[in-house]
């Protein structure tokens, strides 16, 4: 008897969401509309690199790479998704690192914003960027796409930290992309290990009997580079190294790597007006203070190349080493004049424009001595620095730095603070509450303005970090035109002006001062560290018996009064807090990603 072939079973579905949902309802295998060609090209490259890495035993064959197409998922930009799966305590867990791919061939709709302009409201249009595209809806659609492609419809999807492959990146640079793939898989492993109950890193793991730890400061001023080769300003590089004691050998015929981690930073001289007299009573400050406050801006935190893990505990330990630039006021060495550079945005002599002299101090001659340098800084720069971090939602540490961004404020703040404190307690073995009360004090506060990240081309055609245009850079670029310089400075921190207007005006100054080669990749949230948290972290690590020697710290100012303090605890906390409050606005621009349950980081 001949069997009757049955046709496909027809299911009645209710059309919801309009015509845009038709492909979700009537799903088919193939497509002819092409989609995002750049994302398709990237997928082919990554699949090739995946096969090579597995064949060369650089990676295990236990991960996937999916394309998240903008047309299919109705989002602003396509992405590649590096995916790892595991069953943890009976729960299907999927971790992904989204590699978002902006495309110059795709024009995003502009953002329409209503702003207050005096007594009136007006609507302005602003260009959308990657941060605008990567919303909670975008993340939720990534989760739906992964569940569909893996067939794990009930799986928990965790975010290993998104990054951006900029539109101008050459997809033929396979060496860099292979390293990006390996790093992305390792970041997925970080999140799976955390969920699986892996023992967290602690400083107790470093207390070997045959070695010591030493911090080294490097002031070459050459930029570091991120995973894709884009420059990161690094006027000061603090590296932590393990040093074997004399006569000790760890391995026969093999020299182990000695570097543990490194932190990049630069000194931004924030203009700090004199405190005004209080409305009631005596003035808050009777002594005339220098007009500039040094802000140590941390731009990059990374583990040594040989160390593949990157966890909250490892990040905090590396971060703590940034504070060692306070030893003997070492941070000031990054401001020393560079002889031979004619057009120098970092010429410290430009701060003379803000002095009573109201003129540039000539620093490029042999007659400008170390004594002159010390006197210039003593008169113009306050001795105690503020510490800041540029936190990047799409950087190499995105999964960790998103937690610190959440700690700046918003609906996820409480969870973020708890995660940071838990990380510190893991690092030191518990008891951090003896050093810092996070219930009554913030860990970090918002600067109030997003920092545009990107690069420009210098005179030799080399890419340099856009953040070279800081307070000192703008003073030099404006040639002492204080009115123009103050207009630039307002685009950086005048919270009375809408952030989108500040960003637009800031980009105009970028083109004026840096040239038309300026290219933007994403934005960073600049946070100001609570000085009491800095002290507490430093003391807590020291309290568990970890001693770090300073390998190459020299006295910068000899016997001058501005010689500074030997440890961060010696700084006047109230003085630092005063600076912080002058820079922070409660109305600071801090857009929240991942409202409620949508972030995927926790």
From Swiss-Prot:
Q: Which family does it belong to?
A: Belongs to the Phikzvirus chimallin family.
Specify whether Transmembrane is a keyword of the entry.
Answer: no
* Complex and partners: Homotetramer. The tetrameric protomers further assemble as a square grid.
- Renumbered to this chain, the Low complexity biased-composition regions fall at 1-14
Name the job this protein performs. Answer: Self-assembles to form a proteinaceous shell that encloses the viral DNA and compartmentalizes proteins and DNA during viral infection. This micrometer-scale compartment contains narrow pores and is the site of viral replication, with the proteins involved in DNA replication localized inside. Provides a surface for docking of capsids during packaging. Probably protects the viral genome against host defenses.
**Keyword set, alphabetical order:** Host cytoplasm
Where is this protein chiefly located? host cell
This chain belongs to the protein called Chimallin
Instruction: Report the locations given in the UniProt record.
Output: Host cytoplasm
